[in-house]
Amino acid sequence: MVTFVSMSKKGVLLVNLGTPDSPSVKDVRKYLREFLMDKYVIDLPYLTRWFLVNVIIATFRAPKSAIIYKQLWTKEGSPLLIYGLKVQKLLQKKLGVDIHVAFAMRYQNPPINKAIKELKNKGIDDLVVIPLYPQWASSSTKSSIEKVKEELKKQHYSPKVRLVETFVKNEKFIAAIAENGNKHWKTGKYDKVLFSYHGVPERHVIKDCESNYGNNHCKLDGNCCKTYTDKNRLCYRAQCYETSRLVAKAMNLKETDYEVAFQSRLETRARDPWLKPYSDIVTADFPKNGVKNVLAFSPSFIADCLETTVEVGDEFKEIFEENGGENWQLVESLNDSPLWIEALEQLSLNND
């Protein structure tokens, strides 16, 4: 008697945040509206959020943002999309034909619903979802995961799903960041390293900790993030500090060699502060404290984008030099580096 064993068909879904379809004001406004209307990004009541986003932010910010996106845009298009598609192809090659790799953006294109349809049509019944945000946050990771769940339900598609919520402890991910940094740090030209992470409202961090752990472990006082434990594993701030410690260790940095700060704040209310210290203020203060040469990382971004190339690479450099700084160097993001692809291979195969 012959017994046939049914083999599961495996797939991986990579999800990044998103990018406008073009640097035109129209497309930038469309992107901002979809992004900022997400209840996980701006968690205000719907009507308040709608007015804030559609009447104020998208109206006045889109023309300014379009100018910045034009600086970033290449002949191929948006770097975030270009690298996303490259990584998809490289990971597909790494994993081989037995595991199908799909790629989507949480906002705009390629959309999550299209990727889910692709996986369903391929007959994938064992799916790994990897949101491409190293540090878990409700405004990025949770939002993407919930969107994937929503689309799976809409399409009546029920594969076995494994979610990769965070990968700050993945050794190859850390090694990839350190490898890029050491190209510059080992030249001996720099006095200080800045690890600049995307900011989020303090309120989000506290609320997420209470939601995830049912306690008020998060004090935002510097002490609760000194160690990374089960009690703060999904605390965004704790993950940022843990990432910094691990990269510093991989680069043989002393604690006094680096600073951690938070960028890209969008304070919608005076009493709604974002995570501190603020990267732009830390940058301005460096020269005043005798720091003239800085090596800057953006470890919350796995591909170069507006926040890395323009904000950290150009705007912070200008702030630094205006205040007496001499040498500002942005470390490139992981983009499509071999170690980053190896990290994704591990995460896909659950060998983290």
What are these model-derived regions, one by one?
Residues 4-352:
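Active-site-proximal alpha-helix that buttresses catalytic centers in soluble enzyme cores
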